[in-house]
C-alpha cells in the first residue's frame, strides 16, 4: 500500500523548503524480499544505506542489514544521522557521510572548521568507520581515509539554486570515483 499518514514541512530558509511525507506501509514480507535482494550482493559490491528509516521498520534496520552482510566483503556506505549512523560503526562501514552539523551532534560540540572535522572524523574511525566524508555546505568537504590520508576540498564556485540532494550527490560522486580508480583522490 502507498497510503501517506503524515506530512512534515520544514522551512530551511527564504529560498528553500522541504516537505516530507511518511512512506508506504512496509510488511514483513517486504523486508524478507529486501534481504533476498541483499543476498545477491557479491564481494566488492557497494551498498549505500541512506536517509531515515520509516517508522514502521525497526530503528536498527541499517545495523541489522550490516550484521546480515558481515564478512562478505561488501563496501557499505552509510549516509544517515545520529543513532542510525553511530549504531553501525561496530560493523566497520566502508564510508560514512555526516555533514559537519551532524558530526557535531554526535559528539555534542559545534564544528565550524576543517581541522575540527578531521579531529572528530578520526574519533568515528576509532569507533569503526573506515573512511569518513564530511560535507560542509559552502565550506567544502573533508575526507579522512582508512590509510590516514586527509583531503580538504573547497566547494565549487557558483550560485546555489537548491541544496536538496547535495549530500546524496556527494556520496554518488565519491562511490563512482572510487570504483573507477580504486583511489581516494
Protein language model annotation of sequence segments:
Residues 1-5:
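Short, small-residue-biased leader/transition segments that mark boundaries at the very start
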Residues 10-43:
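Conserved phosphate-binding/catalytic loop of the ribokinase/pfkB sugar-kinase fold
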Residues 46-116:
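Conserved beta-alpha-beta core of the PfkB/ribokinase-like small-molecule kinase fold
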Amino acid at each position: 500500500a502507498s497510503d501517506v499518514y503524515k506530512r512534515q514541512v520544514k522551512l530551511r530558509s527564504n529560498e528553500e523548503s522541504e516537505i516530507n511525507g511518511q512512506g508506504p506501509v512496509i510488511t514483513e514480507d517486504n523486508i524478507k524480499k529486501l534481504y533476498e535482494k541483499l543476498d545477491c550482493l557479491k564481494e566488492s559490491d557497494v551498498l549505500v544505506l541512506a536517509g531515515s528509516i520509516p517508522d514502521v521498520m525497526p530503528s536498527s534496520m541499517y545495523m541489522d542489514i550490516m550484521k546480515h552482510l558481515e564478512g562478505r566483503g561488501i563496501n557499505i556506505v552509510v549516509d544517515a544521522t545520529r543513532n542510525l549512523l553511530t549504531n553501525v560503526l561496530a560493523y566497520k562501514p566502508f564510508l560514512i557521510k555526516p555533514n559537519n552539523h551532524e558530526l557535531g551532534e554526535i559528539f555534542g560540540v559545534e564544528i565550524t572548521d576543517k581541522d575540527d572535522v578531521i579531529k572528530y572524523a578520526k574519533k568515528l574511525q576509532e569507533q569503526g568507520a573506515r573512511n569518513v566524508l564530511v560535507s560542509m555546505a559552502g565550506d567544502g568537504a573533508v575526507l579522512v581515509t582508512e590509510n590516514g590520508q586527509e583531503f580538504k576540498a573547497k566547494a565549487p564556485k557558483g550560485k546555489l539554486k537548491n541544496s536538496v540532494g547535495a549530500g546524496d550527490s556527494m556520496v554518488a560522486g565519491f562511490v563512482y570515483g572510487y570504483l573507477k580508480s580504486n583511489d581516494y583522490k
